[in-house]
Amino acid sequence: MKILHTADWHLGQTFYEYDRREEHLHFLEWLKQQIRQHEIDVLLIAGDVFDSPNPSAESQRMYYRFLREVTSENPSLQIIIIAGNHDSAARLEAPNPLLEDMNVTVRGVVRRNAEGDIDLQHLIVPLYTEGEVTAYCLAVPYPVSYTHLTLPTNR
């Protein structure tokens, strides 16, 4: 199984008033080429997809166009995306019903079960080779304050 790990795309970023859009477009084209050339099975995007929790429409189009194109060109590619500190976890997860049809799994929000414990099953993503589970990815998004584990105060 070949896993390609990326992070910190920061789509939509300007750097000292320099718009990095062209740079991002070139990166995404290069990434598609690498996935094709090296026959990648899993693409892991570990946070900071966007530079802002409220990305521009153009940045979102760039992101979704990339996901559509790369999954169309590589039907067996599995993509796992986790939210970083620059991303809006809820915004990243919002299109999950559509993305799941493209074999894209997004984990942005740490969920809790009925007992109030972190739902670890939600964070464990099976990785497949030829339809068989061959590994697991623990897809833990950036821990925001309300998801931190708390220790008992009476010790």
Name each model feature, range by range.
Residues 147-153:
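Conserved small/polar residues in nucleotide/adenosyl-binding loops
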Residues 1-4, 123-138, 144:
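Beta-strand-turn-beta hairpins that frame and shape the catalytic cleft
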Residues 49-66, 83-102, 108:
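Metal-dependent catalytic neighborhoods of phosphoester/phosphodiester hydrolases
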Residues 106-108, 112-114:
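Extended, Lys/Arg-enriched charged tracts that mediate electrostatic binding to polyanionic substrates
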Residues 80-83, 139-143:
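Divalent metal-dependent hydrolysis catalytic cores, especially in the metallo-beta-lactamase
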Residues 78-80, 105, 136:
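Proline-centered loop/turn at the N-terminus of a beta-strand
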Residues 1-68, 75-76:
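N-terminal active-site segment of His-dependent metallophosphoesterases
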Residues 27-37, 119-134:
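Short amphipathic alpha-helices and their capping/turn segments at secondary-structure boundaries
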